[in-house]
């Protein structure tokens, strides 16, 4: 997959430059496993020298997903589908949505290239949980809350599109943006959440050496562009924001806490202190006697 990330000061100057460098991978490997549905795949593979294995929803894919079904309970979000093409297999994945289908297909294709038996691939996909990637924190039967590393416009839009497909009562997002990073991420995430979430809780996410007030001001610019009537609240301290999300959750809500995912720290003024969102949510739920 390829999307317009890692562009800005200290990274790549343009998307074209980023794509060019990433395309070098397919001139330096024996086998390339690629998403045939990605609009950038053709340009990415220009001049490739490796053998290609493709996956996707397209009829042309070597490993193709069909009959996708979304699955949800208060403590489970997942998807089931059938794989056809070079294989014939029913798959159930403990992670939700379209992007999980693509991730599972990619893993399956790599497994086949490496010669893994179908039984091992099937079992692995069924048990797979990626820490900080649509990671459910089952603290209540009333609502669903999850952690995800989405930290730019593209990944946020993909995640919210996925979660919206499960038809929650409200889609609530808790997010911030990193300090000393491109402001484009702040504008983009703000705009996306304003358009796609029912309610947003703006907070910190590794401020580093920037003031949280300045970061939130940039996010507001994106929010106002995306939807001037968007409903949101600003809570600078991320722990307070987590507590607010739990305290104000409604029956059937789906709450996405995004940006940090698997990270275990909070960075303020270059000082990193422990901050494990899963543990903090579990401790708070126990503290208030949440059911």
Give the role of each language-model region:
Residues 99-100, 114:
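A conserved FAD-binding loop/helix module that cradles the flavin
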Residues 49, 86, 106-119, 123, ...:
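ATP-dependent carboxylate-amine ligase
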Residues 36-40, 57-58, 262:
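Short, polar loop motifs at secondary-structure junctions
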Residues 1-10, 42-90, 123, 128-133, ...:
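Extended acidic/charged loop-beta regions that coordinate divalent cations
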Residues 1-47:
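Flexible active-site lid/hinge loop adjacent to a nucleotide/diphosphate
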Residues 91-98:
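A short glycine-threonine-serine/GTX helix/turn-capping micro-motif
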């Amino acid at each position: 997959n390829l999307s317009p990330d890692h562009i800005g000061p200290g990274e790549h100057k343009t998307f074209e430059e980023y794509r060019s460098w990433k395309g070098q991978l397919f001139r330096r490997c024996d086998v390339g496993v690629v998403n045939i549905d990605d609009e950038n795949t053709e340009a990415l593979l220009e001049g490739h020298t490796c053998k290609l294995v493709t996956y996707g929803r397209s009829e042309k894919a070597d490993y193709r997903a069909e009959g996708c079904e979304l699955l949800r309970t208060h403590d489970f979000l997942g998807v089931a589908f059938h794989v056809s093409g070079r294989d014939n297999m029913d798959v159930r994945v403990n992670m939700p949505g379209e992007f999980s289908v693509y991730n599972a297909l990619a893993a399956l294709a790599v497994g086949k290239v490496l010669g893994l038996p179908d039984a091992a691939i099937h079992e692995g996909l069924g048990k797979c949980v990626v820490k900080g990637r649509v990671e459910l924190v089952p603290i209540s039967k009333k609502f669903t809350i999850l952690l995800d590393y989405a930290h730019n416009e593209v990944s946020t839009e993909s995640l919210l599109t996925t979660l919206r497909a499960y038809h929650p009562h409200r889609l609530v997002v808790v997010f911030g943006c990193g300090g000393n990073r491109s402001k484009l991420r702040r504008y983009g995430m703000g705009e996306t959440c304003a358009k796609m979430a029912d309610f947003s809780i703006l907070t910190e996410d590794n401020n580093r050496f920037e003031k949280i007030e300045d970061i939130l001001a940039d996010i507001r610019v994106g929010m106002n562009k995306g939807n001037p009537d968007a409903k949101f609240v600003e809570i600078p301290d991320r722990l307070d924001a987590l507590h607010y999300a739990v305290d104000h959750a409604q029956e059937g809500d789906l709450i996405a806490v995004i940006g940090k995912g698997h990270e275990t720290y909070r960075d303020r003024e270059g000082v990193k202190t422990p901050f494990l969102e899963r543990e903090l949510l579990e401790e708070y739920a126990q503290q208030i006697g949440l059911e």
